[in-house]
């Protein structure tokens, strides 16, 4: 059993090291994790530091250097073409995994629950709503999950058979929302119809765990983005 994991890096060697070390420490999996690094060159010297660090670990099966980055969706699309496993984790360099994450449990959820296409690892205790959108706690095959209103780019594990044929490598730094606009076109012009139940049917996006589940990671990159 294999999971492919992309670390999305952008000229921030200090953050990259914290992120990678946290993954090595806290990811728990009985199978193989195939690590891949995408380095977007926003600063040549800092990116070279990132690459030297990655190469020193002998951890990454693939190290891709993008000299002219066109946005995060394009970066992800480049790596998706190299994914071999049925499950894919996208992890940004500015997220630190702060507690153990059982990937065997995630795979079991995917295998037993065909409606689940994405599991997001929350950055804070899972709340009952987000921006006025009311979440729903569900239980499938003994696992408690909470609906998520969007396709989350990071940090999350994806069902490749669902997302790969739908993926659009939208250019620009608002590509996440453009991508979601494509995936959520059924609600375009009718946002009132976007309920937790309809998200389950259309997207299959969930937070791992019930309402109140403690956060799995912290975001370190506030005001540290070099993207323009």
Residues covered by each model-derived region:
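Active-site nucleotide-sugar/metal-binding loop of Leloir-type enzymes
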Residues: 77-87
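C-terminal catalytic/acceptor-binding lobe
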Residues: 18, 151, 155-161, 165-228
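Short beta-strand-to-loop element that shapes/binds the nucleotide-sugar donor at the catalytic cleft/hinge
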Residues: 117-133
């Amino acid at each position: 059993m294999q999971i492919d994991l992309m670390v999305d890096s952008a000229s921030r060697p200090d953050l990259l090291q914290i992120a990678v070390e946290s993954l090595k420490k806290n990811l728990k999996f009985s199978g193989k994790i195939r690590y891949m690094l995408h380095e977007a060159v926003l600063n040549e010297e800092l990116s070279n530091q990132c690459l030297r660090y990655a190469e020193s670990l002998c951890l990454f099966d693939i190290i891709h250097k993008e000299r002219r980055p066109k946005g995060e969706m394009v970066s992800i699309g480049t790596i998706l073409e190299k994914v071999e496993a049925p499950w894919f984790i996208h992890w940004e360099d500015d997220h630190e995994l702060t507690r153990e994450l059982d990937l065997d449990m995630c795979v079991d959820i995917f295998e037993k629950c065909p409606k689940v296409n994405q599991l997001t690892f929350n950055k804070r205790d899972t709340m009952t709503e987000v921006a006025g959108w009311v979440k729903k706690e569900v239980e499938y095959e003994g696992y408690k999950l909470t609906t998520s209103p969007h396709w989350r780019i990071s940090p999350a594990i994806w069902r490749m058979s669902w997302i790969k044929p739908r993926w659009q490598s939208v250019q620009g730094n608002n590509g996440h929302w453009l991508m979601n606009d494509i995936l959520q076109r059924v609600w375009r012009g009718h946002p009132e119809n976007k309920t937790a139940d309809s998200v389950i049917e259309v997207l299959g996006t969930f937070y791992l765990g019930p309402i109140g589940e403690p956060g799995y990671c912290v975001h370190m990159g506030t005001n540290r983005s070099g993207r323009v």
